[in-house]
């Protein structure tokens, strides 16, 4: 069974990544981003794989700008918190520069979910990518 984050989980992860208290600009956008990984269509998961769910969360948080500042950092932290509580670890030696590039791409361009999911899987510890 997949475990999901709630609003407070996302804000906590984001505050840690941001290094201070986050200011929410729009709670509706924040709640929509938090709910997106759980979306279903006619009772079927809209995002069936764990990587798809994490990508949906990351994309929505990075692009919706629900926060005054720290949207990309919160998106990264929330996606990896979500993956962590579902048994996936971030590789200790992940490419920080590539992660930063990914977040900038997601925030400023139309990145499809499959590409984001594949990138996230590439950052996972080797034994976790299956």
From Swiss-Prot:
One of its GO terms (molecular function) is kinase activity. Pfam families: Fic. Induction: Constitutively expressed in all growth phases, part of the MSMEG_1276-phd-doc-MSMEG_1279 operon. Negatively autoregulated by one or both of Phd-Doc. PROSITE patterns: FIDO. Coiled coil: none annotated. Disruption phenotype: The phd-doc operon is not essential. A triple TA mutant (missing vapB-vapC, mazE-mazF and phd-doc TA systems) survives antibiotic challenge, suggesting the TA systems are not required to generate drug-resistant cells. However the mutant is more sensitive to oxidative and heat stress, and does not survive long term starvation during aerobic growth on complex medium. There is a difference in the level of branched-chain amino acids, which may play a role in monitoring the nutritional supply and physiological state of the cell. Residues 5-126 form the Fido domain. The keyword Transcription applies. Toxic component of a type II toxin-antitoxin (TA) system. Upon overexpression causes bacteriostasis. Its effect is neutralized by coexpression with cognate antitoxin PhD. May bind the 30S ribosomal subunit. In M.smegmatis 3 TA systems (VapB-VapC, MazE-MazF and Phd-Doc) may be involved in monitoring the nutritional supply and physiological state of the cell, linking catabolic with anabolic reactions. This is Toxin Doc. It comes from Mycolicibacterium smegmatis (strain ATCC 700084 / mc(2)155). The lineage of its organism: Bacteria, Bacillati, Actinomycetota, Actinomycetes, Mycobacteriales. The gene is doc.
């Amino acid at each position: 069974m997949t475990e999901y984050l709630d609003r407070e989980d996302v804000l906590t992860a984001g505050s840690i990544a941001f290094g201070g208290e986050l200011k929410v600009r729009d709670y509706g956008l924040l709640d929509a981003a938090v709910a997106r990984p759980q979306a279903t269509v006619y009772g079927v998961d809209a995002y069936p794989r764990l990587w798809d769910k994490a990508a949906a969360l990351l994309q929505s948080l990075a692009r919706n700008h629900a926060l005054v500042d720290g949207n990309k950092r919160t998106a990264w932290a929330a996606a990896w918190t979500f993956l962590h509580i579902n048994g996936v670890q971030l590789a200790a030696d992940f490419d920080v520069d590539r992660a930063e590039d990914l977040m900038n791409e997601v925030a400023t361009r139309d990145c499809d979910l499959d590409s984001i999911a594949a990138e996230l899987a590439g950052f996972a510890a080797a034994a976790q990518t299956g």
